[in-house]
Amino acid sequence: MSVFALGMILFAYLCGSLSSAILVCRLFKLPDPRHHGSGNPGATNVLRIGGRGVAATVLVFDVLKGMLPVWLAYHLGATPFYLGLTAIAACLGHIYPVFFHFKGGKGVATALGAIAPIGWDLTGLMTGTWLLTVLLSGYSSLGAIVSALIAPFYVWWFKPQFTFPVAMLSCLILLRHHDNIQRLWRGQETRVWKKKDRRKGPGKT
């Protein structure tokens, strides 16, 4: 491994280790997301704690910290293999941040950001898959799980040279959602939004 590749991987990990959820919550004087809500320092939990505006800020920074190192490595001529390692390093930084005792989030937004430099068509498909799943089910975690499962197939169709590293990213995301999968199976997962029951009349509650 070259010094350049090693440097990019380390830079990606350090970028990922900057926990947007924790830092933004501190900035807005909100509770630590690691100790409130679901306990996960990610945009969905911040949505529960601080509302849409703060959650959107966290989401943007989580995406950017995956996108920046991969975009930089891409434009500096890194091979697909090392681009994949750079993307994985950014997500590992988010999940196991060195600056926050190695206790981080689940890496979904950071993974999306890391995939973005590969192609905006892929990014659009991934985002659309997540949004459609969440709109139909109400579960943010299910959106992440479905997107992670289908991402390698999207990449194989559009940019096959990146299939293996994206498959590794997907495995990482699915492993981090192990508890969510169990709660979904038991019907105990918390929805981010609920459909209104149209069967209820105006006088029913």
From Swiss-Prot:
Organism (species): Erwinia tasmaniensis (strain DSM 17950 / CFBP 7177 / CIP 109463 / NCPPB 4357 / Et1/99)
Entry EC no(s): 2.3.1.275
Record-annotated membrane-spanning stretches: 3-23, 53-73, 80-100, 112-132, 138-158
Enzyme class, first EC level, given as a word: transferase
Protein's name according to its UniProt entry: Glycerol-3-phosphate acyltransferase
Function (record text): Catalyzes the transfer of an acyl group from acyl-phosphate (acyl-PO(4)) to glycerol-3-phosphate (G3P) to form lysophosphatidic acid (LPA). This enzyme utilizes acyl-phosphate as fatty acyl donor, but not acyl-CoA or acyl-ACP.
Metabolic or biological pathway, per its Swiss-Prot or TrEMBL entry: Lipid metabolism; phospholipid metabolism
Subunit text: Probably interacts with PlsX.
GO MF term set: acyl-phosphate glycerol-3-phosphate acyltransferase activity
